[in-house]
A protein has these predicted regions:
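Structured loops at beta-to-helix junctions and adjacent beta-edge loops in soluble globular domains
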Residues: 28-31, 331-333, 388, 428-430
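Acidic, glycine-rich low-complexity segments with interspersed aromatic residues
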Residues: 160, 182, 287-396
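Compact mixed alphabeta submodule
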Residues: 390-456
Length: 457
């Protein structure tokens, strides 16, 4: 039930015999339901980031300092992975415990940045806490049994904080972060904003990406329902004097509680972006897409500078003619019992540098939507590849780099006895896939237990 108690009880009462070099402790895991706490206990990772926990278990002794070692047998590993996959670290009860622990340490109400600074649970677990509690302020009010209105917070303030909670904390790219920072601090020079952001970026921040960020902050990009949920607020405007906050944004910032909450969210986003910047040198592609990092379809639309959020219509792939990009999304282990033969595509890695992929059915090499890929040498269509092993991993995909077309040929796929047209592509991967990740993707799970999971560093 507790990572601390697990460590206290591990090998309790045992001592190294005089003259022996080491002591071996064999622990039989009985409580499978909570064994996601084992990597937290043994390796001291309190972030509760699922990818971090999987990586730690896979790496074994690599994550332990000093002369100690740790080994898990295969069944134990599988059960720990299964618990990590199935456990929600966004349940209010769990988050309340983490909040109370931090509150006790600090002797005051913790900010999001306190979790970042104290090497505790990742503040991203609170961004948002749950689908029902959509900002950290609302989480605290619910925990402390107070109402936001007691702090002068209106529904408009809450809608705005929910918007920024979704947009900023993960630090996916710097543009929105530096634009909002400038508005709060009274910096109106767009050139100086761009210069500061570029100094802290591993890729070129081009005009299209700045236009995309400004559009998002001017109530663009999002779907109509999303805009309404977030209050239909435009935050920035451009004029002869450069960048400035809109009147609506100025009015929101007059409330000190709102301003403090926004600054806290912004600080987390800048800190997360800085961490990404430091660890991703040499792995960052255009749009701040980092090889082996994970993104949702919505993230991809944003980072590829699409005008609108097209996440619900991408499915396996989609050509955006405005940006000349065609991201491909692959679920490697498909649920064959619940999909038709016409969508059971046999996409696969032939080796670390070659990927075989199939278009939608009822397509040929003459289909308009495929011309950018078929004639990529002249079209210059960018084709980022996103892969996840199974639907059990959630909605995020590993970005594995961009694809370059080697060949495209007409083929067939069978569905209920019918032969349907399809196009088979072979792509060269601009970044060879990590060998451990490739082995993981190619390993078929046994029963309901997932196999070894490796998230490359």
């Amino acid at each position: 039930q507790s990572a601390i108690i697990f460590v206290q009880q591990l090998g309790r009462g045992l001592r190294k015999l005089q003259g022996k070099d080491f002591l071996t402790v064999i622990d039989f895991i009985g409580n499978y339901q909570n064994n996601f706490l084992i990597p937290v206990a043994l390796f001291g990772d309190n972030s509760y980031n699922k990818d971090n926990l999987r990586k730690i278990v896979s790496g074994g002794s690599q994550g332990i300092f000093g002369n100690s070692t740790v080994d898990f047998d295969r069944i134990s590993k599988d059960q720990i992975y299964k618990a990590i996959n199935e456990t929600s670290f966004s349940q209010l009860k769990f988050l309340y415990e983490q909040y109370q622990n931090m509150q006790a340490k600090l002797g005051r109400t913790p900010k999001l940045m306190d979790f970042e600074a104290m090497d505790a649970i990742s503040p991203l677990r609170f961004c948002p806490p749950t689908n029902q509690v959509k900002s950290y302020l609302e989480f605290r009010c619910k925990k402390e049994k107070t109402e936001p209105s007691e702090l002068g917070i209106t529904e408009k303030h809450l809608q705005s904080l929910r918007f920024f909670t979704q947009l900023l904390p993960r630090g996916l790219r710097p543009q929105e972060l530096y634009l909002i920072k400038a508005c709060i601090n009274g910096n109106h020079s767009l050139d100086s904003i761009k210069s500061e952001a570029q100094k802290n970026s591993n890729c070129i921040l081009d005009m299209r990406s700045w236009s995309s960020a400004i559009s998002i902050l001017q109530n663009g990009f999002l779907k109509v329902a999303e805009k309404a949920a977030f209050g239909n607020i435009s935050y920035v405007k451009l004029g002869n004097n450069g960048l400035s906050p809109t009147d609506d944004f100025k009015a929101l910032l007059e409330n000190q509680c709102y301003k403090s909450e926004l600054e806290d969210i912004l600080s987390v986003g800048l800190a997360e972006y800085k961490k990404q910047f430091l660890r991703s040198k040499g792995k960052t592609q255009a749009g701040n897409l980092v090889v082996n990092s994970k993104y949702s379809r919505k993230d991809a639309c944003r980072l590829l500078n699409w005008k609108n959020n097209e996440e619900s219509t991408i499915y396996g792939y989609k050509m955006d003619y405005d940006t000349n990009t065609c991201p491909i999304f692959i679920t490697y282990d498909k649920d064959t019992e619940n999909i038709s033969g016409s969508t059971n595509y046999q996409d696969r890695f032939i080796n670390e540098e070659t990927f075989e992929w199939f278009s939608r059915n009822k397509r040929t090499t003459s289909s308009e939507e495929l011309q950018g890929l078929i004639n990529q040498a002249t079209s210059k269509t960018r084709t980022p590849l996103f892969v996840k092993k199974s639907d059990g991993e959630g909605t995020d995909f590993y970005y594995l780099g961009d694809l370059n077309t080697i060949s495209a040929e007409n083929s067939k796929i069978e569905d209920k006895g019918k032969q349907l047209d399809i196009v088979k592509f072979n792509f060269h991967m601009s970044t060879p896939i990590d060998e451990n990740l490739l082995n993981y993707l190619d390993t078929k799970p046994t029963g309901n237990i997932q196999s070894d999971i490796v998230n490359p560093a």
